[in-house]
């Protein structure tokens, strides 16, 4: 759904940038002239001059440098700061549209900034991406363990992370995090006695099996409702005798969990 979202930036409670002013800056950048830029942007020369004065006055740095007089009203060019403003404005406009598009995804919690940003801007090769809240950090030296409660409110994960990384991510109880787990790192077992062989052992039910030549993809619905993907060697999968509806335990160690968050 393409929405018309008009981005307006204000500084000191005064208009700094809007679609018309950004269009003017782009035309000045293209033509090297305020008068030609104004004409192509569909505004008068006086309005263009006033807009540039306003932006240059409000901004911490000059956006447009100009030379008065001369043919066509004098030359002008954007400073590096002005060029970056255009880039930032276009970036914000893209983010606004992508954010609006998340309205169509009813499964996405819009009360989570991390979940929203990750969904429309973050692409990773990890098949398993779980949103959750950090509930505990052990503060050991060098390597630490953190416990994460997933957004289903039931499933808990343990992740291993270096002390330096935990400090850099500013991990503390209550912080929203994204846990990434690659599918080959997830092993499946059916014997509950083997559940203690890994740091994380999540019970669930086989939802689907996609066979391949050497490996197969197994989707497991966890007891909390989240889906987890595992790729299994076909010989191992055959030994487990899995089928849709089979009860399984998904296992992976804490050092196989990658943590991402907003700082």
Swiss-Prot record:
Keywords: Activator, Cytoplasm, DNA-binding, Molybdenum, Repeat, Repressor, Transcription, Transcription regulation, Transport. SUPFAM superfamilies: MOP-like (SSF50331), Winged helix' DNA-binding domain (SSF46785). GO terms for cellular component: cytoplasm. GO terms for molecular function: cis-regulatory region sequence-specific DNA binding; molybdenum ion binding. Homodimer. Residues 33-79 bind DNA. It comes from the Bacteria. Residues 124-132 are annotated as: Required for dimer formation and molybdate binding. Belongs to the ModE family. GO terms for biological process: molybdate ion transport; regulation of DNA-templated transcription. The ModE-Mo complex acts as a repressor of the modABC operon, involved in the transport of molybdate. Upon binding molybdate, the conformation of the protein changes, promoting dimerization of ModE-Mo. The protein dimer is then competent to bind a DNA region, upstream of the modABC operon. Also acts as an enhancer of the expression of genes coding for molybdoenzymes, both directly and indirectly. It holds the Pfam family TOBE. This is Transcriptional regulator ModE. Residues 1-120 are annotated as: I. It is found in: Cytoplasm. Residues 123-190, 195-261 form the Mop domain.
